[in-house]
Regions:
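Repeated loop/turn-to-beta-strand initiation elements of outer-membrane beta-barrel proteins
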Residues: 19-25, 64-69, 110-114, 152-156, ...
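Flexible loop and strand-edge segments within Gram-negative outer membrane beta-barrel domains
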Residues: 1-8, 14-97
Length: 402
């Protein structure tokens, strides 16, 4: 009930032609089988099979003043849905993406640089007994960036971007960012941008649940990072603000099917913070990290919290390494999370704390074995309604570096 089996294969090869040119090839193959959980013995068991293929060819040309990266990629996804695991598939579909991208950088001098990016992709989709015939879409974009570093303590970046999507109107986008090293212990980082996202094939055609009436999503966002450093300590504190028009969100509908829809206006603000400590002494290394995230994300029209966006999240990591052995611990607290915009406490996900711990042992030069206990305190918790995650479980791995 709810079992799954995932397999992934990766391969990568690179060849340096000369001092200026390098080519590389990377490929990933993935297969996954997911049995959806049932909540009573009378329900019919269902399953979902997905297959993914990714392949990327990369040509990197570099001189003292010029760097150009040209990429060609092919991506393919296929899914099969079985409304009864003992019968033939009831629906399915496949998507193919052909992609070409060129990233050109020119260094004018030590203070000024330019970046031009062009991209084109052809998207194709096909369905099986899902209401989808053959669909196809052309999309592309051009972007320009200017990087200016007037001094070692100050740098800025500004950019413009225009998307071109078949049958969809697109706005001109912009971004601006900068960093100021005020002194040796404090830095200020700021970012502001206008962003755009058009509905993907999954958003439009996924069956069951796709929505052909979706609008494109636009947003304005800004954040202000504050970085403090003292000896072995680093502290990052970043307030942020986001305003989104026609936000695309996948949520369960009245029939229990996950489906995307637009939310007219969403306003989100909050704070991200993280404290880090690193100390080396002899063969010893100690690391500690503690973070807190506060998010207030609401539908402006209803003034209610968005579902599946917790207000409070705390996370931490600690590790100690001596020579060839390392022990570590990871912890996360997730606050109360609403699962619908009516803010019903009865259906909200309860807050939870999960902790993992383990060790790594390095054997010889190229081998490392690891052991890990997940959900150490055997908590019962959910990140999605009605889908409880595993209780205490264990994992072992072997890492070989060639």
């Amino acid at each position: 009930n709810g079992e799954y089996n995932n397999r992934t294969f990766n391969i990568g090869v690179a060849y340096k032609i000369d001092s200026k040119n390098t080519i590389s090839w990377q490929t990933q193959i993935y297969n996954g089988v997911q049995h959806y959980p049932i909540f009573s013995e009378s329900m019919t068991k269902t399953k979902y099979i997905s297959d993914t293929f990714r392949s990327l060819v990369n040509w990197n040309f570099r001189t003292e003043k010029v760097q150009n990266i040209f990429r060609l990629a092919y991506l393919e996804d296929e899914f099969q849905y079985f409304s009864n695991i003992n019968k033939a598939k009831s629906s399915g579909g496949s998507a193919k993406i052909y992609l070409a991208k060129n990233d050109f950088n020119y260094i004018f001098n030590e203070k000024l640089a330019f970046n031009f990016i062009g991209e084109y992709q052809l998207n194709k989709g096909q369905g099986f007994q899902s209401g989808i015939t053959n669909v196809e879409r052309n999309a592309g974009s051009i972007a320009g960036l200017v990087r200016w570093n007037p001094s070692q303590k100050v740098n800025f970046e500004a950019g413009l971007k225009k998307d071109f999507v078949e049958a969809i109107e697109t706005p001109v986008l912009y971004s601006f960012s900068g960093k100021v090293n005020v002194n040796n212990w404090y830095s200020l980082i700021f970012n502001a941008s206008k962003n755009f996202r058009f509905p993907s094939f999954n958003d439009l055609y996924w069956q069951p649940g796709g929505n052909l009436d979706l609008k494109s999503e636009t947003s304005l966002q800004a954040d202000l990072g504050n970085r403090f450093q003292y000896k072995n300590f680093k502290l990052n504190v970043t307030p942020f603000y986001i305003n989104i028009e026609n936000m695309i969100r996948w949520l369960p509908n009245s029939g229990g099917i996950w489906s995307p829809s637009n939310i007219n206006n969403v306003e989100s603000y909050g704070l991200e913070s993280q404290l880090d400590f690193v100390k080396d002494f002899g063969k010893n290394n100690a690391k500690f990290s503690l973070g807190y995230i506060y998010t207030n994300s609401k539908n402006v029209e209803t003034n209610r919290f968005l579902s599946y966006v917790p207000q409070h999240k705390i996370f931490g990591n600690a590790s100690y390494r001596y020579d060839f052995i390392e022990i570590f611990a990871q912890g996360m607290f997730n606050g109360l999370t609403f699962t619908s915009e009516d803010e019903k406490l009865s259906s909200a996900l309860k807050s939870y704390f999960v902790m993992n711990a383990g060790l790594h042992i390095k054997i010889l030069k190229h081998y490392q074995i690891g052991f890990k206990a997940n959900n150490l305190f055997d908590q019962i918790y959910e990140t999605t309604a009605y889908f409880p995650l595993p209780k205490r479980n264990y994992a072992a791995n072997l890492l070989i570096n060639f």
